[in-house]
Regions:
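Flavin-dependent oxidoreductase catalytic cores
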Residues: 1-208
């Protein structure tokens, strides 16, 4: 069945195939059974993972199917990257399939529906057995990267088990300049300061 599904999805343009898979995943609890074993369990930064295999950010960008991903067996799911405002991303085509190399290359550009729509999905969460991460990034036309990250981390904090600050995208002009030591220290210090009144401090990761 897996091979048949993959063959069918490959008949579509890659981004269309992704959108179809998101729709199909809403029926995942009917199609799959979750496997658990104590030998696979992990604990990292105080978070308990049922297994070390997770779904990275970039798949469930708008927090639509993370619970289905939990139900089919992922040990954690990281949703996003989400930006403060809705963003179309780069012009299409922007996802390229290389079957011979079993590779998929994307130049999406943080396409997503924005943090308010994103949180509507996250607030429906009922499965708290596996960690849910939220990956945050700035809008392409922002005037201030740090302001965008500060808005996002404060809105997302209470709904995430951990937060990933994405400063890796080559599709957002000058974003990677935040990887400079001085700029990164300023970013981190601002984010930490903005969360100082939170009763529970969530783990924060930096994606470089």
């Amino acid at each position: 069945m897996d091979n048949l599904l993959i063959s069918l999805l490959r008949k579509f343009e890659p981004e269309t195939a992704h959108d179809i898979s998101i729709k199909l995943l809403k029926f995942a609890p009917i199609l799959f059974n979750k496997f658990r074993h104590e030998l696979l369990e992990q604990e990292i930064v105080g978070l308990k993972f049922q297994n070390p295999v997770g779904m990275a950010a970039g798949y469930d960008k708008n927090a639509e199917v993370f619970e289905s991903l939990f139900k089919i067996g992922f040990g954690f799911v990281e949703c996003g990257t989400v930006t403060p405002l809705p963003q179309y991303g780069n012009p299409k085509p922007r996802v390229f399939r290389y079957i011979e190399e079993s590779a998929l290359i994307n130049s999406l550009g943080f396409n997503n529906k924005g943090i308010n729509s994103f949180l509507n999905g996250v607030q429906k969460r009922t499965d708290f057995d596996s960690p849910l991460g939220i990956n945050i990034g700035p809008n392409k036309d922002t005037k201030n990267f740090i302001d965008d990250y500060t808005i996002l981390i404060n809105k997302a904090h209470d709904f995430a088990d951990y937060i990933t600050v994405n400063i890796s995208s080559p599709n957002t002009e000058n974003l990677r300049k935040l990887q400079d030591k001085t700029a990164l220290e300023e970013l981190i210090s601002n984010l930490v300061a903005s969360l100082k009144d939170k009763k529970v401090q969530k783990p924060i990761f930096i994606k470089i």
